[in-house]
Amino acid sequence: MSKNFGVDSSQIDTLLEKLRLASGIKGKAMLDTYVQFAARYLINSDAQELAQLDFEELTADVEQAWSFVQERKTSRPLVRLDQSERRELGRATPITTLRVLLDDKPFIVDSLRQALLRHGAAIMEVRNTVLFCGRRKAGSKAEGYGRFGQLAALSNSVDDDFSVEAFCSISC
């Protein structure tokens, strides 16, 4: 199911199965899309970083990221800041996560990261991926996909019906 980039494949497969069971998503097709998204979102993560995260915190992060990519109405970038807490050594540390979804552009993650660093942000983790998204506008026919609307499917490669979108999540 997974390739080994930053995370051991058995580690990511175990996490994906736990996420599948915890998701509460109805319908096999959408559940499979959710697991595919989670795999793409987590695959470049540092193995030690993932091992240290509490499963509930990781689940919340994946759920927030999944919720964020659900609808894209225009070609303008989507940007959102999420606030949360991370528990470390018995104390809560506030976390701000910048999430950005836009048409795929080279070096976008590095540009965002550098801008945050220039403004004094202490970056804790960066997760980014390229998504091949099949979207449908409300009320549109069931066959075929477009660039905008509700996320209906993900692909593993470029396809004429799927838009290429860059998604990144930077926690400070």
Regions found by a protein language model. Give the residues of each.
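Regulatory modules associated with amino-acid/nitrogen control
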Residues: 1-121, 128-129, 135, 139, ...
